[in-house]
């Protein structure tokens, strides 16, 4: 009888240990981390462009806009050219203040509930020269 009780105790401890290990993986598995991407304002060759001009991200990701060449630059998201057609969303993503010096940066974090689709943006001083870009938020 003692032998059976001891065997059951060992079996119970083994099962409990396995359950504890398995459940700790479920609790401590990190969720998908948001990423940060960099978009240069002005090319390395001094062209009035965003580099890259097109970028694909996920909701919750951050885009850093780095003033590179030929300042001043800013980043304005077009209210009519975003999936939500929302002026408030475009305003919250935009940075209208001009970055005057190379190396200055500003960043935008896309909300976790940002609708999937294309978000068009431009540099106000250089829009006429073709300084426009597009960020695609993937679902």
Curated annotation (Swiss-Prot):
Please report a single Pfam family linked to this protein: Copper-bind
Keyword Cell membrane listed? The answer is no
* Location in the cell: Cellular thylakoid membrane
Organism superkingdom:
Bacteria
Q: Which UniProt keywords apply?
A: Copper, Electron transport, Membrane, Metal-binding, Signal, Thylakoid, Transport
Keyword Membrane among record annotations: yes
Which Gene3D superfamilies does this chain map to?
Answer: Cupredoxins - blue copper proteins
List the membrane topology term(s): Peripheral membrane protein
Give residues annotated as binding Cu cation.
Answer: 73, 123, 126, 131
Alphabetical GO CC annotations of the entry are:
plasma membrane-derived thylakoid membrane
What is its cofactor?
Cu(2+)
Start and end residues of each Plastocyanin-like domain: 35-135
PANTHER family found in the cross-reference section: PLASTOCYANIN MAJOR ISOFORM, CHLOROPLASTIC-RELATED
Instruction: Give the protein family.
Output: Belongs to the plastocyanin family.
State the protein's purpose. Participates in electron transfer between P700 and the cytochrome b6-f complex in photosystem I.
Q: What is this protein called?
A: Plastocyanin
Task: Please tell me the species this chain comes from.
Answer: Trichormus variabilis (strain ATCC 29413 / PCC 7937)
Q: Which gene encodes it?
A: petE
């Amino acid at each position: 009888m003692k032998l059976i009780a001891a065997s059951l105790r060992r079996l119970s401890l083994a099962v409990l240990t396995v359950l504890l290990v398995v459940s700790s993986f479920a609790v401590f598995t990190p969720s998908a981390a948001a990423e940060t991407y960099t978009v240069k304002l002005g090319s390395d060759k001094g062209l009035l462009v965003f580099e890259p001009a097109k970028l694909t991200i996920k909701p919750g990701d951050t885009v850093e806009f780095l003033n590179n060449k030929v300042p001043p630059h800013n980043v304005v998201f077009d209210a009519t050219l975003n999936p939500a057609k929302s002026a408030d969303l475009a305003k919250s993503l935009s940075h209208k203040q001009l970055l005057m010096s190379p190396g200055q940066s500003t960043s935008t974090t896309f909300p976790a509930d940002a609708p999937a689709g294309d978000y068009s943006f431009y540099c106000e001083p250089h829009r006429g020269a073709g300084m426009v870009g597009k960020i695609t938020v993937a679902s």
